[in-house]
Amino acid sequence: MKNFEQVLKALQTGEVIAYPTEGVFGVGCDPDNPEAIQKLLELKQRPVEKGLILIAASYEQLLPYIDESQLTQEQLDQVHATWPGPYTWIMPASDKVSHWVSGQFDSIAVRVTDHPLVQKMCNAFGKPLTSTSANLTGQPPCMTTEEVEEQLGDRLVAILRGETSGRNKPSEIRDAKTSQILRQG
């Protein structure tokens, strides 16, 4: 567990980390730390306007970031029926969410993961992580620790060693208000 503690410490001190998810490796940081998010965006060569996903161990961890008042109970039930799992939902963002996370949108992309290592990290950290695929923009997402080290290693502080859950593709993204699939999973 030495690696886990090392990665948690990096996360707590505002660094960008890499970690296995259901389908591909992700990179992320503290969603409430603008400097950490800037590092992440620079690492990925990703424009801030695109926004980032928040990945959490539980729905409760996401509540401070979501404006539930804009969703019906039926819409919320539809979201909850897919979690935990590889489904990302676009939901109305709360006032707490900075533009560093939401990008150009007034919504936020959120997921409750069923990956045990990510659940453990989010629980130890006490809140969600930002999440985007571990790759440079335009490159294929990394599937293994070795691929992360090859593509991003010299730019990352810590990689949480482990395996993806074997889905071999990024999570499906849906809109909670319309149920529209925005990215096939």
Curated annotation (Swiss-Prot):
Protein localization: Cytoplasm
Pfam families registered for this protein in UniProt: Sua5_yciO_yrdC
One Gene Ontology term, aspect cellular component: cytoplasm
Documented EC number(s): 2.7.7.87
Annotated family: Belongs to the SUA5 family. TsaC subfamily.
NCBIfam families (UniProt xref): L-threonylcarbamoyladenylate synthase
Protein's recorded name: Threonylcarbamoyl-AMP synthase
The organism of origin for this protein: Vibrio campbellii (strain ATCC BAA-1116)
Species classification: Bacteria, Pseudomonadati, Pseudomonadota, Gammaproteobacteria, Vibrionales
Gene, per the UniProt record: tsaC
